[in-house]
UniProtKB/Swiss-Prot annotation:
Ca(2+) 2 binds at residues 173, 229, 231, 233-234. The keyword Secreted does not apply. GO terms for molecular function: amyloid-beta binding; heat shock protein binding; ICAM-3 receptor activity; integrin binding; metal ion binding; protein kinase binding. Its main location: membrane. Mg(2+) binds at residues 136, 138, 234. The gene is ITGB2. The chain crosses the membrane at residues 702-724. Heterodimer of an alpha and a beta subunit. The ITGB2 beta subunit associates with the ITGAL, ITGAM, ITGAX or ITGAD alpha subunits. Found in a complex with CD177 and ITGAM/CD11b. Interacts with FGR. Interacts with COPS5 and RANBP9. Interacts with FLNA (via filamin repeats 4, 9, 12, 17, 19, 21, and 23). Interacts with THBD. Residues 725-770 are cytoplasmic. This is Integrin beta-2. Residues 124-363 form the VWFA domain. It comes from Ovis aries (Sheep). It is a single-pass type I membrane protein. PANTHER family: INTEGRIN BETA SUBUNIT (PTHR10082), INTEGRIN BETA-2 (PTHR10082:SF15).
Amino acid sequence: MLPQRPQLLLLAGLLSLQSVLSQECTKYKVSTCRDCIESGPGCAWCQKLNFTGQGEPDSTRCDTRAQLLSKGCPADDIMEPKSLAETRQSQAGKQKQLSPEEVTLYLRPGQAAAFNVTFQRAKGYPIDLYYLMDLSYSMVDDLANVKKLGGDLLRALNDITESGRIGFGSFVDKTVLPFVNTHPEKLRNPCPNKEKECQPPFAFRHVLKLTDNSKQFETEVGKQLISGNLDAPEGGLDAMMQVAACPEEIGWRNVTRLLVFATDDGFHFAGDGKLGAILTPNDGRCHLEDNLYKSSNEFDYPSVGQLAHKLAESNIQPIFAVTKKMVKTYEKLTEIIPKSAVGELSEDSKNVVELIKSAYNKLSSRVFLDHNTLPDTLKVAYDSFCSNGVSQVDQPRGDCDGVQINVPITFQVKVTATECIQEQSFTIRALGFTDTVTVRVLPQCECQCREASRDRSVCGGRGSMECGVCRCDAGYIGKNCECQTHGRSSQELEGSCRKDNSSIICSGLGDCICGQCVCHTSDVPNKKIYGQFCECDNVNCERYDGQVCGGDKRGLCFCGTCRCNDQHEGSACQCLKSTQGCLNLDGVECSGRGRCRCNVCQCDPGYQPPLCIDCPGCPVPCAGFAPCTECLKFDKGPFAKNCSAACGQTKLLSSPVPGGRKCKERDSEGCWMTYTLVQRDGRNRYDVHVDDMLECVKGPNIAAIVGGTVGGVVLVGILLLAIWKALTHLSDLREYHRFEKEKLKSQWNNDNPLFKSATTTVMNPKFAES
């Protein structure tokens, strides 16, 4: 029952898709059946003779099947090519996991062609396993165990397949700073323990080509020595790229390919090479010389995306055997590299055989169906119907997990062309497997019209009938080739059908017949196209209430402009010709401060609807009406001699009116006038009510001001002199008291040091002796 479900879903999907696509046909500049087919998947062409009437364009023949049938086109005359898929199964006797082997598609633009691809996982499918090992110094214990793995690895493969082969390669890093120590002595022996024998560092060494000889594996791997480098990340991506890019050197067969990547650390990727002055991007090509990657110091590390593409292209499934601390790092890497797995490697690699078996079972139980790069004109989508009951629809690639041996799973592949394409091919494959499906794509854009329709008599003997349309001989044009050009070029005839030298003939809405436009009959009900250049119609006008020009009761559309009847106006005849809603209590339209449009006032700036009476933000013109107020009320001021002429529009009110604006301005004599302005209909038109009393202020007493000022200055001067005199007296008094105190302290008991006595006494020294 399982294979029937995808077929039923396929049929239902195609019927649903066809139903949706056939509901509409959007066409533009259609004159042939091919143009119609390219317009959209829902378009069909009627080849019936004389299907179009006078003035109808050839594009009338292009419509949905339902519309053509409703217009009287027989079903046998409807050209509607479909997208088709033809499959060719695999040759008998060949072990294939993917079928069919070849598919031929005939694609109509916009219409998908669908076909089924079946994958059946085979038991005992041949396997090639390449063991790629990190030989940096931290892997010294692991190398000792791997040297003994040859027999175990082959026995593990033989449990899975009848034909298994193993190979070996190793890597360290680029041999430049800062990746390795470039001191000559360190290059000879990079290990930290000088007594231990180590080999010089290298980027990648291909040690053993894929073989089924386990003894040879153990012999060659047994010769390997540990090496070393400086930084923690290793050059593993460099090595993986060479393993994928050198199939002949590695010895890959066209079978399942496994790459076991064993390490205890991270990896360098694109851009890290700049640290060692390596700027050239990795080219993804094979550069092995004497089994060594000698161009390592010339090319940067590959990017993860670049490596993922190369591995997928080579159908290589990587298994990352890494230590516990690196598991999460490489799990992130497997999210980018499809068909890859991660296993936790013990510190001494003793569990590597079980790790490989577990990872292989995980990889082989999941199938990704994908295709190579396609141009933008081709779109591919996958529907996956998996054996575990899970289904996915319209995915960029097929994906099924839990695939069991000899249990088929089905993928529905839908291919759509966006335009009429050139013949081309592409390949669908299950990632990690060698089987492919070759898809050949051909355009389905031509109409297989009846040969009988190529009768020249229908075209007056001056052309041939192709799919219901005349193709005229040279010198003749027209629907039935009835117009002779008389030596005039088609450009000259068409020139008279162009408006203002436009590039569009008859505005794109008619045919140029013998130099005159014959306008098309529109597909839109009640639409009429007319004019010398078919530039006019009766529907492309403004609409009101969902109708052109508000409907026939309001007006009619003439060449883009509404012509309203006597009761309506406006660009869409949306307004009644009435001003009733614009009149104020005095019957003035919009209070003289606006215009009435559609029975609604459009007020002048500042004035508010509905009747333009109030202007909250307008300034009160008090100062401007002060001269008229003075002459009207007090018969004085600048307008006193011609008050009636200058202020004839301003009326003096005898009593105050509520709602006016209070003003207070000076008259010509400096007195204050208090008055109220009452606005009338219109702009800047006011009546005025003036208070009887003027507020006049007496002038200042000049003599008092001058006398007071002079007296104040004199008094201030006298006061300053008195203050100065008092301060001087106090200072002298303080000095006098200090002198008196010093005088009392003085004592005159000592002799004058300058006085000399007039007598001198001299003693005879001999007198005492006698």
